[in-house]
Amino acid sequence: MTVYSYLVILFILLDNYCSAYGYGYSYYHRRHFDPAIASFTKEPYIGAVWFTQHGDYMYVNGSVAGLPPGKLLGTHVHRYGGLGNMCLEAGPHFNPFNQRHGPRHGYPRHAGDLGNIRVGRGGVAKFDFYVTIKGLGPFDGFIGRALVIHANRDDLGRNRDEGSRTTGNSGPRLACATIGFRAP
């Protein structure tokens, strides 16, 4: 047998081992987020927010109009994509690892914690930030879930009460949109 033959056998065995323990293609696929978009189309909230992975970070950019001017508003990805009943069908924050609520760059935190956005004088909020995804472990991403904009500022889980640890005391849900695959 040649060295090449041994290498081929080694790679086949390694691939089978990795696949058996969840580190093959399926692991990579769960770690890589396909480009996504959340389109806000229900008046008065109009806009779009894009999600694009860059290594260990998710770039979030876009804008939503029709929000209360001059406020900081909590934003989160919620577990479900349902938008009914004033966004309550979106369920709780996306939290596959049962962590405390926190800031978008801190740990522990929910996978769906996006922090606060500032609404300008004209009622338009601009999204333009990176979210750390390194260390969150493999999960199936944001596709099919809802992006929710809340009525209050997110306290980022810094208070000692239960509301802070679960929702950041962000208040009622103002606007929501289902996150779907983005066209190339």
From Swiss-Prot:
Q: Which PROSITE patterns match?
A: SOD_CU_ZN_1, SOD_CU_ZN_2
Organism ancestry: Eukaryota, Metazoa, Spiralia, Lophotrochozoa, Platyhelminthes
Keyword terms of this UniProt record: Antioxidant, Copper, Disulfide bond, Glycoprotein, Metal-binding, Oxidoreductase, Secreted, Signal, Zinc
Q: Which Gene3D superfamilies does the protein's record reference? A: Superoxide dismutase, copper/zinc binding domain
- Member of which family? Belongs to the Cu-Zn superoxide dismutase family.
Q: How is the cofactor bound?
A: Binds 1 copper ion per subunit.
The record's function comment reads: Destroys radicals which are normally produced within the cells and which are toxic to biological systems.
The UniProt entry, under Pfam families, shows: Sod_Cu
Disulfide bond sites: 87-176
Q: Where in the cell is it found?
A: Secreted, Extracellular space
Record field: transmembrane: none
A Gene Ontology cellular component where this protein is annotated is: extracellular region
Q: Name the cofactor(s).
A: Cu cation; Zn(2+)
> What is the protein's name according to its record?
Extracellular superoxide dismutase [Cu-Zn]
Subunit composition and interactions: Homodimer.
* Catalytic activity reported: 2 superoxide + 2 H(+) = H2O2 + O2
Which residues bind Cu cation per the record? 76, 78, 93, 150
Cleavable signal peptide: 1-18
GO BP annotation list: symbiont-mediated detoxification of host-generated reactive oxygen species
